[in-house]
Amino acid sequence: LKSLQDLFLAADYSLVHSELTLQAIQQLDMFHAFKQAKSMWFEDALDALEISEISGWPDRFGDALLKWNASNPVKDIRTLSLFSGGGGLDIGFHDAGFNIVESNEIVPAFAATLEKNTADGRRLSGTRIVCKDINDYHPDLDNIDFIIGGPPCQTFSAAGARAAGVNGTDDERGNLFIQYARLIYKLQPKGFLFENVYRIVGAQSGKPWQQIQAAFEELGYKLYWRILDASDYGVPQFRERLIIVGLKTGAFNFPYPSHGPDSGDNRNYYSAKQALETVINSDNIPKALGGRHGHLLNDIPPGLNYSYYTERMGHPTPFFAWRSKFSDYLYKADPHTPVRTIKAQGGQYTGPFSWENRPFTVEELKRLQTFPDSYLINGNRQTAIHQLGNSVPPQFARVLALSIMKQVFSEKIPFDIKFMPANYELGFRARKSKLTDVYALKAKEAIDKIPSSINNAAKHVKHQEYFCIDSDLKVRAGLSKEEASYFVNYSLDSENWTINVSEPPIGIDEVKYKIIIQPPRTDTVLLKSTIELTSAINGEYSILVLWKIFEFLLKRHFLKDDLIQLFGYYQYKKSYQFKMFFQDKSLSDNNYWNVVKKVTEGIGVGVISSFEELSTEFGCSSVELQDILSKMKDYGFEIRNHNTNRQIQKGMILIPYSFPTLNERSLQRLTRL
């Protein structure tokens, strides 16, 4: 197979470079014929199940499997489901003919979903549901043949990584695989399937992955694993997951994809639009997004996200900095492809959103996850999304379960599935790496249609105004001098910005300190202006006031959403230079202000350091530094340690930014060092 792949690449190269030879054509034809013979199986599956690939076909696929199993009973494969969640794996294995005798789930709302679907006549009828912490779960079960489940994966996820590294097995949730292993040891099944996020393989330099493999192998199981994309198996959603199959005896190969470029017949992906064509929604269709960013969704082309509004994409009003948000922020699904991964949790602007510029309904999300229309989901909208987003798509689970049924238990299945050799390389990662260029082209096509006058950012503004900052860090402007706490005199033009903050009524106090910001030569937002922020207030709180008022004016006049969108996410290269100067020389003798100055200028910022290292860097004792950093956190600086972010080890500190970033919506504002 490998040599034929090489032949294909050689033939493909010849075709691309217009060196069309008879040998190249013959090689290409030979490879395609070989590939189809070895890897194509889904068309035969449709024929065997007597279904067609129309909207909602995964439901009919599952129903046809159940019907076939009723007429062709297999031996009783007693299966235990752990971390069952909303039941995605349970549905897939049940439909494939496994007997799910018991399911364990700790969250009552999720267990209630399972209970609803185990009633007489429901899909999982006959399964016993145990709502209990797995640490306290001691099942009294005999002759368990197989175990399925995936422990909670948040500690290995992209969100966990972005919070300041990946917790992995340093977090209690990351160690739940030990309980999984405990039950395998207790029940001694013939095999198991373990599902998790793919990042687990590289988390913490591979240490957790090595621990997981060692734990299972020590129990006497040989592991077969791959990172697979659910869209390759008929799910209208790009969803990469690590799948481990552990066996006491025998061997296992994963199935060839049924859909996409890696399938034997190059079958089209099951698109989001096709999946939703026949969905029946309830009357509770979500309205268009509201809030400060909701209106932005309307103009985002399908398939793109917040990055449409970045300077990198060429947008004339770049609200956001490149890579300053998660990839699902304001992500609008493309109807002609699978959607990106549906997440269990997220904020108001977490996608995917419909191409109709609204959130998807629960019924639509069920289709995008291939949950049966008839499957009951307990709870309100957010609870339902939590369950769906945490689940293995049932259609993906069906294909895996059938593959296990055939290879591990030697049972007949209604059609032949073709299995990949262990060294066969899938191409979804390579295709994913090319998407940035595709998105850029799509963005350019939309941006080229925007009238040049749309950028209404101010080119010259000079004004005086009264402000107030509430205790929750919310800025209020346009006040009377009696209502206000601060008087602001500012001038914004193409060469210089000057913003002076003082106390009412007329702001004639002497300047105490100033901050000079030098934009990079590539800046197109501030028009290369030098920015001078000055404060005539020397109270410790004034550093927050100065930055917050600058941020407010930036958003009002230059359409940047916040300081991070201007200066960039802390893990990326810094392009703006900050300098702080004390006009009031007494500030130089104050450790609080010396620490603020160093942080402003980027010293000790953006890296995780020990308390001792920062104490030396800032020239103060650990006790005093703790007090200063706590004050700065109260004043809006995002200071992180183990108490605020479990990903950070005890005794370590992270100051992500040189300026205060917390606002009235920040949960970090409520945490304490």
Residue ranges and their predicted role:
Residues 98, 221, 637:
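Short phosphate-binding/catalytic loops that engage adenosine nucleotides
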Residues 1-59, 65-70, 299-673:
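C-terminal target-recognition/interaction regions appended to catalytic cores
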Residues 76, 239-241, 337-339:
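Extracellular structured ligand-interaction cores
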Residues 137-146, 156-331:
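Class I S-adenosyl-L-methionine
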